[in-house]
Structure formats: C-alpha cells, structure tokens
Design a protein with these regions (language model features):
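NTP/phosphate- and nucleic-acid-binding module
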Residues: 1-428
C-alpha cells in the first residue's frame, strides 16, 4: 500500500486517551470511526488485521474437521420462542435489539443457538451423520447499556461462533476438548497468553463452561490462575463458603499458589447438553431408530476484542511518553514500512515492487508533504513491525532493517532482502 492512498489524519500523541491509547490512536488517525457509542466503522489497517485473525481461526478449525457456514443476522421471533429465550433476551436481560413491522417481529442476532440447532437438525437426521461442528464468522449485536473500552465492549462486533452436535454426553465432552485445543492453538499463533477459566453458564445455559482470558491492565475481570495446572477461577470464588471443596474438584489444592491477573475475556466454550434440542423438539434417529436429542456445545471468539488486546498490549513508550505500538510480525497486516529521502525515490519504489511481487505486504510512505522525521514517527502509529529508511546512509549494497519494537537493526544485502522477510523477519 502507498501511504498517500490511506489519507491518514495527522495526530498528536499527547492528546491520546491515556487508558485505551492504542485504540484511540486508530480513532484519531481515522482508522476507527465512531458513529455513536459502541458502533464503529473500520479502516484499512483494522480490516486487514481482522482478516489475518480470521484466517488463523479458519485454518485451526478447518484442520479439526469444522465446517464453515453462515446464519442470518436477522432472526425471527418464533425460533427464539421455540427455545424459550425470547423473553430472556428482550425483557429479563434486555440484550437483543428487536424490530417489528407488518412482516412480523425479529431480533438482531447476539448469538445463534436457535439457528444452528434448526440448521443442524435438518442436515443431521441420523446418528450416522454425527459428530458435526458448524461455525461462522460475522457481525453480532448486543444492547450494551454502557458501551465502553472502544472494541472491548461495543454494541456491534465481529465474532466466530461454532456449534457442535453429538449423539452422547461422552462424545460431546470429546468435541468440547477438541475445541479447547483449537482455541489454545489459535491464541498461541496470535501471540496471546491465554488462561482458561471456569465460567458461569449465564443465559446461554448448559452444564459446563469455560472462558479464555488474556491478561491486560485494561480488563474488567479478575481471575486467579494456577500456573502449574493451567486452571483459572474467578476472584469471587474465594468468598464461597464451600470454596475448598470447589477448588479441590478443579484440582486446585494450594490457594496461596494462585496468581491474580486483571484480564479480558476473548472467547468462551459451553457444554449445552440437550437443552436446545429438547426445548426445540429437534431429534436424530439412533441405532435402533429411536428419536434422541442432540448433545450440543457452543463456542465463541471475539475478533474485535482480540485486535484491541493485541494493540493495547503492544504499546511502545520512549522516556515514559507514548510512541505508538508495534504489532507482532506474524500477524501484522503490513510487515515493513519503507521511508525514503526525495533523491532515493526510485530505489524505494523498486524495493516496494520487489516485496509486493513476493507477497510480502509493505507500506511505501510516498507522502511529499512531510519530512523524513515525521514519516518515521508515523511508522509507530500504524504498528508496522519493521522499517527501512533509504537515504544518504544507503550504500547501494545493504538495507538497514529496523525492528520497531526492539530497535535492533539488521544489515541485509539487497539480493537477500526477500529471503530475509520470508524466513528471518519472523523471528521477533
């Protein structure tokens, strides 16, 4: 991408929100646009980063046999009444946006258990069709009374939600474990330390649930994590009258070994049992031709929260002043930003074309109205992990490639530059 095409707004880092600095940088750049509280439009950088996260999720789910589908965002009231959740979501919890016209009454999907159960029952009439896992990635809507934290708690957001179908409780638990492993692989590839945490089932229902929490000072949750066993629990568990028995069931024997973290929830998994299949009267035929309810699970990952967490957790400071952020190389939508002095435009454009031809996404800062110093500063507000400056120090033989997070500079022979980014550039 040529930076002149982005029409990036000029910003002053001293004016940035001190609490949600990374997301506020994008807001002031114009890469996030707030239509009203909790409702955003997304620029090129955010969309590209979202696609990267999406592709990682798709790869990890597909390799485990999950099938990508798509359900409607506009869902009829009648299917939510089948599961007895319409009043729960529109009156008791007041979570769902609804609309009513001459065609009927509808809700904008905050989740899709009803659609998934109907869809699955139509395709999975027999035990021979099981197990199956369907997933989608798309926009969801929730009536957050107090939207806050930019993309940490908005009213519209992009989510991966998956739904599994099994013939028995035992098989459901195996699928649940399979999805747990998929989640851990996804978060590892994103460079996020995740703490699986025992969860409340809430309005989703079911018997067992867990959250996937990431440590961040901006989080709203406080968990206690057992590093040895890899088990997290909510802080309020310590106030339970039967806490020792509860912790023992989880395998936690030494409370003093638990470490406290402020976290944000990036994903959750639920063992639903037969809740939806039974309430919606949707069954499969077992080996004896008898109608049996599906044992289901549901699974969610918030893509917007992941991106917000990645940006906020990778902020850069210089002399205690905010400098910007640097995304991990493996997920950055643009791997390197090329800056040049006027007399070196041809060399910079040649390098840019060379990288693009080898599918190494680069930003060429071709703006004419800014000095080289200001253009270098802008590398950090775009989160680009590598930077090449072509100017008077350029010897025509080597490129100086700077890691924007560490400041380490590699001298790379011109003939080796593609190989560097394909192999060595990922070592951050």
């Amino acid at each position: 991408m040529k930076l002149s095409q982005l029409n990036m707004k000029k910003i002053n880092l001293e004016d940035i929100d001190s609490h949600y600095s990374g997301q506020d940088i994008l807001l002031k750049l114009g890469e996030l646009y707030q239509f009203e509280s909790g409702i955003y439009g997304y620029g090129n950088l955010w969309v590209k980063l979202e696609r990267t996260v999406e592709n990682i999720i798709i790869e990890e789910l597909d390799k485990r046999g999950c099938i990508q589908v798509e359900f409607p965002k506009l869902q009829p009231k009648k299917i939510w009444e089948q599961s007895n959740r319409w009043d729960m979501y529109t009156k008791e919890g007041d979570i769902m946006f609804t609309l009513k016209n001459n065609l009927g009454e509808y809700g904008l999907a905050p989740t899709a258990e009803e659609c998934a159960t109907l869809f699955g029952a139509n395709r999975l009439p027999s035990y021979k069709n099981l197990p199956a896992i369907y997933y989608q990635i798309g926009e969801k809507f929730r009536k957050e009374i107090r939207a806050r934290g930019y993309l940490f708690r908005p009213r519209t957001f992009v989510m991966m939600d998956a739904y599994s179908f099994d013939k028995s409780e035992e098989d459901m638990k195996k699928t649940y474990q399979l999805m747990h492993e998929a989640y851990m692989a996804i978060f590892a590839r994103l460079g996020l330390k995740i703490m699986p945490t025992v969860s409340d089932n809430g309005v989703i229902g079911g018997s067992v649930a867990e959250e996937f929490q990431a440590a961040t000072p901006l989080g709203e949750d406080e968990i206690l994590f057992d590093e040895e066993n890899g088990i997290g629990i909510n802080r309020e568990v310590l106030d339970f009258p039967n806490r020792d028995d509860y912790l023992k069931q989880l395998g936690v024997t030494h409370v003093e070994a638990l470490k406290s973290y402020t976290t944000v929830e990036l994903g959750n998994n639920f063992q639903l049992g037969t809740k939806y299949s039974t309430s919606m009267k949707l069954f499969f035929k077992d080996e004896d031709g008898v109608d049996k309810p599906y044992y289901m699970g549901c699974y969610g990952i918030g893509l917007g929260r992941i991106i917000a967490c990645l940006i906020e957790n990778n902020l850069l400071y210089e002399n205690d002043k905010l400098k910007g952020f640097a995304l991990p190389y493996s997920i950055a939508p643009y791997k390197v930003q090329i800056i040049y002095q006027t007399d070196y435009q041809l060399q910079a454009e040649k390098l840019y074309q060379q990288l693009e031809e080898h599918h190494i996404s680069a930003i060429l800062d071709d703006r004419k109205d800014l000095g080289i110093g200001n253009r270098i500063k802008d590398v950090y507000v775009l989160g680009t992990p590598k930077m090449i400056v072509i100017g008077k120090k350029f010897d025509g033989i080597h490129y100086s490639v700077e890691d924007t997070k560490t400041g380490i500079v590699d001298s790379v022979n011109i003939s080796d530059i593609v190989d560097y980014f394909e192999k060595n550039g990922k070592n951050r």
